[in-house]
Amino acid sequence: MNVPATRKDLMIVNMGPHHPSMHGVLRLIVTLDGEDVIDCEPILGYLHRGMEKIAENRTIIQYLPYVTRWDYLATMFTEAITVNGPEQLGNIQVPKRASYIRVIMLELSRIASHLLWLGPFMADIGAQTPFFYIFREREFIYDLFEAATGMRMMHNFFRIGGVAADLPHGWIDKCFDFCNYFFTRVVEYQKLITRNPIFLERVEGVGVVGGEEVINWGLSGPMLRASGIQWDLRQVDNYECYEEFDWEVQWQKEGDSLARYLVRIGEMMESIKIIQQALEGIPGGPYENLEIRCFGREKEPEWNDFEYRFIGKKPSPTFELPKQELYVRVEAPKGELGIFLIGDQNGFPWRWKIRPPGFINLQILPQLVKRMKLADIMTILGSIDIIMGEVDR
């Protein structure tokens, strides 16, 4: 009987791209020696839509619906960064009530994003059951979003100087009920997942990255805090009104996939604490600074000129961006989401540079998967938590 010779040459495997509703249009060219990963090359750009160039031809209000398509699972953060930049450039005061509403929406969005990370992450490593429990809780958050903003996703809720609408009657009580309910659910997840020996075998010691490495690579968010660095922009920058709440930065020192999971679980618990404090202390008053609406009003056309005769609808008042430059950032669920904004005394930004956390966190993937097994790629990639909408922009 002839035994076939053992194959000794390396094999190249393409992983992805998948549909955007699945893991996204990320393509990995993986070089394998048997099941050992020798090299991994991420190929990006399948979801590139030119978001930075679009911003240069839109006013901020016109651009707001676009930004929800970056990280389409945590849209409140992209809206927050879009209005925070012009607010800081123009020294616009945000009413206290609007700031509290923003914090509540941001933390609900953080929980929803972490839930939608946790469900598929567990399914990727072989645990299907938590997926259904997690989506049940996520639907409750989307019900709250729908009641307040009119949309379950892509909310278009933030405005320069405040928010688009006040909270409806009874919404605060419903949000309190959700917080009390969800707290018990997170405890259930920890019993179901954290102490599961099969889960621990798949994630413990997989994808380890040290504290010095994460700083050198410029990583942020749970990737940074899971490696022993206590850095959270909500405490460092004190944007909105986070300094008025009592909460703790979640961090671990191991730097592996398990540590990143524990950081995100802890962040969901802290988000509930912040929401409860904000609901209890939310002040009265206006939800939007209406004075800024009169900025940049167009001149009235003469009765006989071209605009009067041929342009039926006059342009709405726009906010003029001062001739300055500014970098503004928020702590998104996936890391530091930043905007480098250059104004030019115009309604349109001269430059709108996006710093997406997923794009920068993804850079370390080839280093983390080298000398690991093929099955560990999905564990490590899942623990990084990327959304291709913000990676490709």
From Swiss-Prot:
It catalyses: a plastoquinone + NADH + (n+1) H(+)(in) = a plastoquinol + NAD(+) + n H(+)(out); a plastoquinone + NADPH + (n+1) H(+)(in) = a plastoquinol + NADP(+) + n H(+)(out). Keywords: Chloroplast, Membrane, NAD, NADP, Plastid, Plastoquinone, Quinone, Thylakoid, Translocase, Transport. GO terms for molecular function: NAD binding; oxidoreductase activity, acting on NAD(P)H, quinone or similar compound as acceptor; quinone binding. One of its GO terms (biological process) is photosynthesis, light reaction. It is a peripheral membrane protein. SUPFAM superfamilies: HydB/Nqo4-like (SSF56762). NDH shuttles electrons from NAD(P)H:plastoquinone, via FMN and iron-sulfur (Fe-S) centers, to quinones in the photosynthetic chain and possibly in a chloroplast respiratory chain. The immediate electron acceptor for the enzyme in this species is believed to be plastoquinone. Couples the redox reaction to proton translocation, and thus conserves the redox energy in a proton gradient. This is NAD(P)H-quinone oxidoreductase subunit H, chloroplastic.
